[in-house]
């Protein structure tokens, strides 16, 4: 083959791989099996090794490379990359729009806005010349940023070449690099396991990952990007609408936020603000507000800029999720398994529109790692329904009399000894069900929906039953009578009858629900199901050894030792015997023959998004019946991801890891066959 033929073969392979990458990473529509992709990629690598004269910087094989020699060298933006002015109230938004209308000298004009979520990530500028990515930079001071080209190339959804046959001579594409929330939590959890540094928040994680001297470190981080505007553009006619320019970016091969909307006037902008504020906690990524941009590019050009911000756009910030306050004391709460958790008492402060006076400190390892002391000025975070937490200490504000936090020697509830094993971060009260705090939490767990499901037995009633000495252990619940219950404050005869009916109804259960309800440490729903499938009744389970238990899927040495320890305790066996005597029972499980030829047998499967044909729990049950293991997170060990509509970060991570994606229609064919 002559040089021309070789070059044509290389270009054909590059174009094929770009097409596969675009469908896989951007559209989430894989065109070919992994093996075919790998074959094409390897063929391209071999060509480029044999004929290095045809190796080009836009080749898919150059997405991850060694340490760049020009790391963090300054890069000037062709068009300034300015920050947005912020508004925080409705009045400020009205004033911003009023100023724009007055500047345009069209007092009766209803302005049309492009509205977008304001991602809390790192802004970047990517420059393409002749359709090829030549360099990328951070925002920097707006005029000059840092060269992060090699690191940007590690983000799979960033096209190395634009997907058009007639690209602009030069174009700057602006976007926000971020780490999805689920991936951030998984990364930090893994880092903690390995004793490595964790990140305070997803934005810091994204920024730190992009500013790595070694691009391979960036490649190992779950970075993603949404593009939001065009900077300089040469020899190409752009649409006169910001929303249409975003559609053009999609055609070029970029990811654009699906939450972008068109709005008219103040009311339209405020509707979008409320919509995104309500949806904020369900999004797979962090946002700290919304952005309004006048949609007309010609109007944008008329308005121009003031100082270092555009007159045609602003950011409407959400109430802060992080605030600063003073830690004035530490109390200790006792959980179901005796875990003693430190809780910070704070000078009340408004965070995200809610007054916060308490925050979790997690455990003593976290207190030591963050060096938190009583009297410190601390930063607290409240995100959605998550319990507020102390994120960090502002050491410059530490008073001379700041006191170290001491682990109590005795339980604050029952006075029993508090112990902490050498290999555990958590300290525990050894009082067991003698401790009222543990008994209350145990009863609440026992009565919960996924356990015995005793409707009407809530935390207030549990407090009454325990505090007044009516209930001393779980079995006492099933010996309650109408008169005792009806005489309780705010109870009454009708409520008492309803509770007794719920208790009677709960007696018919399943073995796995009963095991889960017992609250054995390290045994959750999945572990209880595994034990129930293998042992069928209490008698056979209580004689199991650690070695036997460890042969079961999902039962490791720690869980196995807790199971053996639980059934070795005489008082636990007494409670179980009494519960069974009082009528708790379950049908003997039928041996179901699973077709081991089905594609899910023995595989690890993750569900994501919304399935139209069934709920998440029903889908999970069907997968378990097919012999699958259902996991809540995507990793390299995941075999399949079943994707419904509005799938988020799990789907992104699956595509980045090369995990097979199964659409709902294909899934339904198997479960209904």
Curated annotation (Swiss-Prot):
Reaction catalysed by this enzyme: NAD(+) + (deoxyribonucleotide)n-3'-hydroxyl + 5'-phospho-(deoxyribonucleotide)m = (deoxyribonucleotide)n+m + AMP + beta-nicotinamide D-nucleotide
GO cellular component: cytosol
Xref: PROSITE patterns: BRCT (PS50172), DNA_LIGASE_N1 (PS01055), DNA_LIGASE_N2 (PS01056)
EC code(s) of this entry: 6.5.1.2
CDD domains: BRCT_DNA_ligase_like, LIGANc
SS bond list: none
Domain called BRCT: residue spans: 595-673
SMART domains given in the database record: BRCT (SM00292), HhH1 (SM00278), LIGANc (SM00532)
Highest taxon, organism lineage: Bacteria
Active site, renumbered: 118 (n6-amp-lysine intermediate)
Annotated residues for binding of Zn(2+): 411, 414, 429, 435
GO biological process: one example: DNA repair
Keywords: DNA damage, DNA repair, DNA replication, Ligase, Magnesium, Manganese, Metal-binding, NAD, Zinc
Cofactor: Mg(2+); Mn(2+)
Molecular function terms, GO-annotated: DNA binding; DNA ligase (NAD+) activity; metal ion binding
InterPro entries: BRCT_dom, BRCT_dom_sf, DisA/LigA_HHH, DNA_ligase, DNA_ligase_AS, DNA_ligase_CS, DNAligase_adenylation, DNAligase_N
Annotated residues for binding of NAD(+): 34-38, 83-84, 116, 139, 176, 293, 317
Enzyme type, top EC level: ligase
Entry similarity comment: Belongs to the NAD-dependent DNA ligase family. LigA subfamily.
Known function: DNA ligase that catalyzes the formation of phosphodiester linkages between 5'-phosphoryl and 3'-hydroxyl groups in double-stranded DNA using NAD as a coenzyme and as the energy source for the reaction. It is essential for DNA replication and repair of damaged DNA.
Protein name: DNA ligase
Gene symbol of the encoding locus: ligA
